[in-house]
Amino acid sequence: ADVRRVGEGHEASLGYTTCMWHNLRTCKVVFDRHSRLEALQRRFDVPYPDALRDAIIHANMPLLHGALPANDAQIHKAASRGDLVSVNHRVAAFLASYFDVLFAINGMTHPGEKRQLGIAERDCRVLPEDFRSSFDTLFASMFTDTAKLGHIGTKVIDLDSGLPLWQ
């Protein structure tokens, strides 16, 4: 149902939208007595839909910055009050939407939560400038330097540079 909603209905989620579709496309079938999994793999072995890409961008970009309650502002507020649990939670939500948009811009299904930085560096043709160093700064400072966290909305999420390709 989730793969149908995404792959055919082009419905976006807030983060990890195409993760189950990616798993279906890349899984190795070990046992499939009635060939149902194989049939699903054939059904969803289609090019990345433009409508899905657009839906993911439109659903997730406002949560990155510029809207209420955008995650960049929530991260800054949590950091300024010293609420480390909230910082962690907001950064995780931010990254879920961020990578959803990044993979959508690049027409890639979302590979899941593991090794996203490396996969993005290896496979994405559109990446923000200073992609890796921005994340290194984010992770090195997210619990120690609230001033650096304030730049998350401009430095790390420089995804707008990729959007004119699609709008």
Where are these regions (language model features)?
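Small-residue-rich helix-loop
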Residues: 90-97, 115-119
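Short, charged amphipathic alpha-helical segments flanked by flexible coils
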Residues: 107-136
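Terminal (often C-terminal) interaction modules
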Residues: 126-167
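Charged, amphipathic alpha-helical oligomerization/scaffolding segments
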Residues: 63-70, 93, 97, 130, ...
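Charged/polar positions within long, soluble alpha-helices
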Residues: 73-76, 80, 99-110, 114, ...
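Conserved NTP/Mg2+-binding pocket subregion across the NTase superfamily
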Residues: 1-79
